[in-house]
UniProtKB/Swiss-Prot annotation:
HAMAP family: ChlB_BchB (MF_00353). One of its GO terms (biological process) is light-independent chlorophyll biosynthetic process. Keywords: 4Fe-4S, ATP-binding, Chlorophyll biosynthesis, Chloroplast, Iron, Iron-sulfur, Metal-binding, Nucleotide-binding, Oxidoreductase, Photosynthesis, Plastid. Substrate binds at residues 433-434. This is Light-independent protochlorophyllide reductase subunit B. It comes from Ephedra altissima (High-climbing jointfir). PANTHER family: LIGHT-INDEPENDENT PROTOCHLOROPHYLLIDE REDUCTASE SUBUNIT B.
Length: 509
């Protein structure tokens, strides 16, 4: 738990609620004070769904603090059981209500005696983990609960007759998750691999018993789904892939690993093994436009330009590799806020970036951007805000994001169509060649600057002494003109004819 002005990853209970609201016919109950129950509004706004968000707040107020929470929580659990008739109810405290140190498992046990629905308490330490880690843990807990339950009733362990896959980690409020899921389904259809389950988004908890029937598991995002894949491998020996099919090179690598995972099962079933090399070649040469674009004169204009990349571990690592090895763009600094996955992230990007930044502090990211002065930024909504402050364009490549990055149109980042979308995003995030040249010559079309120059305050002509002229180049280029204008404006107001370093600092104050 952390007190902060702004956080990249939210509190733990948000992760648990995302899991619950991704499944069909699952209800979540928050044991929370007023103020912690913003998830309903946030999800309704961002996901633009027709249905109400199936999450209820069991409010902790002064009466509850005086009498204890048991009656209110149990009553809310039973009420939702009758009203909604869900397959599963997940109870979660928030980091605030966790301070009360109540025995919520006892409340769940009491309600389970009467309830027709399954009820579980989210097994998450709200003081130690964030939204991402809590979502990963909660998904694994739900899968473990239902598979353990089915084991007692004899679980069907027979594999599907044809190659099949589980896609694990598609979530509500995920960054382009719905679009990526469609693209992954299209990819597996092209490879003649059947989709066994997609969890948790749109999945049913009653169908979790069929997870072990798949030939392999794919975890497209490292942040959420790996714990479930580990559990399925340990309990059922299911192989899993955690490579993200983002970018031309990693798409090919992912498909080759799928081939290696499928062929051993094919030999067991007495079927012919698969070879996807011709498919990779065809997609790379004719379907993905990113390959020829990276060789075009447009992309060559980016040579020598600097970028800063920041986001979750999956997207930041993938975009860094795409920029550096597929488009020849220099990545001056890349980073992630996923501190728990820092070792993997460093291993992935160490050969593609001059500097690596692991932090949850957006102020440090802002300082790094100000220091580097990149031509473009690729990050979250916070990096977009930072970019606006410094007048640097930002392409959004990772959560957290606002509503404009929940597009209604089809915008995958994964698969071969995703390579086209990423190429467009990168291209549109830079000032174009001739545009950049004209801006250097004419200084753009800043009308405020024209007005300031044509309407000087007072009639004084100010001059800069030698020291102050030497100081000006030390100021970052993107704010240098503004500093110069504001200093001259300050000098004219004060009646100062000669600008010294002292006048510059006084103007700054």
């Amino acid at each position: 738990m952390k007190l902060a002005y702004w956080m990249y990853a939210g509190p733990a209970h948000i992760g648990t609620l995302r899991v619950a609201n991704s499944f069909k016919n699952v209800h979540a109950i928050m044991h929370a004070p007023l103020g912690d129950d913003y998830f309903n509004v946030m999800r309704s706004m961002l996901e633009r769904e027709r249905n109400f968000t199936p999450a209820t707040a069991s409010i902790v107020d002064r009466r509850v603090l005086g009498r204890g929470s048991q009656k209110k929580v149990v009553d809310n659990l039973l009420r939702k059981d009758k009203e909604e008739n869900p397959d599963l109810i997940i109870l979660t405290p928030t980091c605030t209500s966790s301070i009360l140190q109540e025995d919520l498992q006892n409340f769940v046990d009491r309600a389970s005696v009467i309830s027709d629905s399954n009820i579980i308490l989210a097994d998450v330490d709200h003081y130690q983990v964030n939204e991402i880690q809590a979502a990963d843990r909660t998904l694994e807990q739900v899968v473990r609960f239902y598979l353990s339950k089915q084991k007692k009733e004899k679980l069907d362990r027979f594999l599907t007759d044809v190659p099949s896959v589980n896609i694990i980690g598609i979530f509500t409020l995920g960054f382009h998750h719905q679009h990526d899921c469609r693209e992954l389904k299209r990819l597996f259809q092209d490879l003649n691999i059947q989709i066994n389950q997609v969890i948790p988004e749109g999945g049913s908890v009653e169908d979790l018993q069929n997870l072990p029937k798949a030939w392999l598991n794919l975890v497209p995002y490292r942040e959420i789904g790996l714990m479930t894949a580990f559990f399925l491998k340990k309990e059922f020996g299911m192989p899993y892939l955690s490579i993200t099919p983002m970018g031309v090179i990693d798409n090919a690598e992912c498909i080759r690993r799928i081939e290696k995972s499928v062929n051993p099962f094919a030999s067991i079933f007495g079927e012919k093994g698969v070879n996807y090399e011709s498919y990779i070649d065809r997609q790379t040469r004719f379907i993905s436009q990113a390959v020829w674009f990276s060789r075009s004169i447009d992309c060559q204009n980016f040579t020598g330009k600097q970028t800063v990349v920041f986001g979750d571990a999956t997207h930041a690592a993938s975009i860094t590799k795409i920029l550096a090895r597929e488009m020849g763009i220099r990545v001056s600094c890349t980073g992630t806020y996923c501190k728990h996955d820092a070792e993997w992230f460093k291993e992935q990007v160490q050969d593609f970036s001059n500097e690596i930044l692991i932090t949850e502090d957006h102020a440090k990211v802002g300082k790094k951007i100000a220091c580097v002065e990149p031509s473009a930024i690729f990050g979250t909504q916070m990096e977009r805000h930072i970019g606006k402050r410094f007048d640097i364009s930002c392409g959004v490549i990772s959560a957290p994001v606002h509503i404009q990055n929940f597009p209604l149109g089809y915008r995958p980042f994964m698969g071969y169509e995703g390579t086209n979308q990423i190429a467009d995003l990168v291209y549109n995030s830079f000032a174009l060649g001739m545009e950049d040249h004209l801006l250097d010559i004419f200084g753009g079309h800043d009308m405020k600057e024209v007005i300031t120059k044509s309407n000087p305050i007072g009639g004084l002509d100010v001059i800069w002494d030698t020291e102050s002229q030497l100081e000006l180049p030390q100021i970052p280029r993107f704010v240098r003109d503004k500093v110069k204008r504001e200093t001259e404006k300050f000098a004219k107001i004060k009646g100062v004819v000669k600008i010294t370093i002292e006048v510059m600092y006084a103007a700054k104050e």
